[in-house]
Amino acid sequence: MVKRQTDTIFALSTAQGKSGVAVIRISGPSSMEALRLLGVKDDISPRVAHCRLLHDSKGRLIDQAVVLYFPKPGSFTGEDVVELQVHGSRAVIRLLYEELQTFIRIAEPGEFSLRAYLNGKIDLTRAEGIADLINAETDAQLRQALAQSTGKLEKQYDQWRSILLDILTDLEACIDFPEDVDSSCVLGGIYNNIEKLCAVLGQYLNDGHRGERLRSGVRVVILGPPNAGKSTLFNSIARRNAAIVSEHPGTTRDVLEVAIDIGGYPYIVLDTAGIRESCDGIEQEGIKRAKMAAEEADIKIVMYPYETTSMQGIDPICDLQDEKTILVLSKADNVDLPESKCIDGKEFHLISVHQDRGIGKLLTLIQEKSRDSFPQEGDVFITSQRHRSHLQKALQVVDAVSKVMPIEIVAEHLRIAAYELGRVTGAVSGDDILDDIFSKFCIGK
């Protein structure tokens, strides 16, 4: 995909399906010729909305459209761009696609954003931020995506790379012009700056993966013995019948998950098989998967029936003392009791799904337990494993620098670190990286 940048492309930039308005974007050197193909013969002023009739090759009317023209380089892609705002009818879209495909080609996923990157309109972190913005489902995800798509990460990473390149410039002056430079003084400053940068990068990487967790959601697993009410709670949180509920123990065999929004933050809630001793092979596999889900979860909700009076002789399922574990007694129906109950020195939260009691408090507890799992608003955090990998490599090579190294070797370490930081923003890149990033975009972006 990276190599084909001289032709003209088009795609639907709005969602598929019926809608009041649909936008078709055209980008490339033949954008205006494509518009002429649709019967628009008069001049179109840049950045001015024009109402025009679009026709097929036989002169038959397709639709009345609002036409916008953005000449290069002042467009999103940096190329000549035409946007057609038409009625969101499947028939209209199909006819326009049929006409345009005779002259230009359909864009590949993410190709508009790729061209924007290749033409210097955005860096890779901004491009990834655009993808996150499109996929954002909660307020917090939206805020993080907006910060990234408007250049906060780019500014941070470029600043660190600039520091490295400045250090490298001073170091190369010592190498190339030793007679003109007070090497001992300059090298002292260089090593001091390297040490400071290592500390900053190390602190930045030691972030608890908050940025990535905000993208993917905090994982909350519901655990407990069979018939503890796990699936009933799961359905209540999901606000739909996502899991089968039955009086027969062992109904849930596989791990089910649903994405929810709690207070503007993303969570993935998982329902699991009841954990008990079983000779049934399928149930054993479900129990195995439940335990694996527990190991990977950020928060565990451990449920027991309300009738439970002691934990003695009961398989604890997981570490009940873990600060990320919430203990719950379910089926507390028709009982006039406080919100919690103490059993063997452990506090259990009481819920009744059927009477809608305690669910709101449980969601509040989940929020409190996950408060430090998300970045604070305004913070600039690592948002993907790709970023983290390059930053870790940069820190690794810079941290390996020592004063006993020949300065030529130190310079090479700094070059590698600058290269790794450049890979994050795309200041240096390879086709494999670009294809991997932009292929995850939707067609019209």
Curated annotation (Swiss-Prot):
Cofactor descriptive note: Binds 1 potassium ion per subunit.
One GO MF term attached to the UniProt entry: GTPase activity
Coiled coil: none
Gene Ontology CC terms: cytoplasm
Family: Belongs to the TRAFAC class TrmE-Era-EngA-EngB-Septin-like GTPase superfamily. TrmE GTPase family.
NCBIfam families according to UniProt: mnmE_trmE_thdF, PRK05291.1-3, small_GTP
PANTHER family referenced in this protein's UniProt entry, alphabetically: TRNA MODIFICATION GTPASE GTPBP3 (PTHR42714), TRNA MODIFICATION GTPASE GTPBP3, MITOCHONDRIAL (PTHR42714:SF2)
Lipid biosynthesis is among the record's keywords: no
Alphabetical list of CDD domains matching this protein: trmE (cd04164), TrmE_N (cd14858)
Residues holding Mg(2+): 231, 252
GO terms classed as biological process: tRNA methylation; tRNA wobble uridine modification
UniProt entry keywords in alphabetical sequence: Cytoplasm, GTP-binding, Hydrolase, Magnesium, Metal-binding, Nucleotide-binding, Potassium, tRNA processing
Main location: cytoplasm
Quaternary organization: Homodimer. Heterotetramer of two MnmE and two MnmG subunits.
Listed name of the protein: tRNA modification GTPase MnmE
PROSITE patterns tied to this protein: G_TRME
Enzyme Commission number(s) from the entry: 3.6.-.-
Stated role: Exhibits a very high intrinsic GTPase hydrolysis rate. Involved in the addition of a carboxymethylaminomethyl (cmnm) group at the wobble position (U34) of certain tRNAs, forming tRNA-cmnm(5)s(2)U34.
Short name of one Pfam family: MMR_HSR1
Domain TrmE-type G residues, every copy: 217-371
Cell compartments where the protein resides: Cytoplasm
